[in-house]
Amino acid sequence: MRGAAGRVWVLNLDAESELSATHSYAPTQHLRTIVQRERQRLIGTLVGPNDVVLDEERIERGDPLPERIRGWPGLAWCPTPRALALLRRVGAVPVLTPGLELLRTINARPFAARLRSEHAPGSFEKHCATDMEQALALLARPAESGWLVRREFGAAGRGRRRLHSGRPGADELVWLQASLRQGPLIIEPWVAIEREYTRSAWVRRDGSVLISEPCAQTTTEHGAWVDTERIHADAITRADDEALEAMTERVARALSVAGYHGPFGIDAYRHRLPQGGATVLNPLSEINARFTMDWATAMARDPRTGVALDELHRLSAEPVIEETT
């Protein structure tokens, strides 16, 4: 159903913070500032010229909104309760969405770790710690470059910390304790990453999936996204390409079985083995069951533009029917 001229967007790039909250959630002013800055990079790619992006602060101030957006389809970066409430507040009709607990399950890092566990030959093992005793036992193991500890939820470099092998320091113990109160930790060896990959996709209601061409991703040393570009077939080995395609299909099946449909992306990378040896593919670092910063670039039919608006129109043009649970 697409009688309206555009879509209404909530670009809640702080979604993982909301998913990790055990009670009511409100972003800090610092986080609001980051979201405000980063979402500008989605204008003209994910967000079309006729679309309207909702600004929560403007709505809270009572600033007038275009009357024409009432009844328009509403999309969110991630359809969390706050995002859906904001869409409904202005009269937009949210596109069919999963429930909160499902979003938490499929975006939590242990979900990705379980899917990866049997399909990463040659790469390292990820460990899940649910209490401090488990975490300390894992961190005490020898690791050439230390350990990367990830909280249950995190994005843009947030919710992770590099720790040396052995007994953590006082401030590190405080961070571990605070992190465990939020949920289990994923602990993995710190590795030297040679090249990062992403695959974007859309899993349909019937479980079928549309997968993008391979893309190369650049992030900061802290894991925050910088940019993504489509890569030519000769810039990735056939083995890596096939492994990433297979992993994306595997993730799509798992998401569909769990009850999710819509956009998602996976992160992967090729890293060096210990002692500076050969490189090996880690086919699944993260699952983002939502839109991503590179979804438009990856899914665009014309890679020169990085605009996936036509593709998004086709994929989201199903009848708008809200789920009842």
Regions found by a protein language model. Name each.
Residues 32-48, 53-137, 141, 154-155:
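Conserved N-proximal alpha/beta basic substrate-recognition cap immediately N-terminal to
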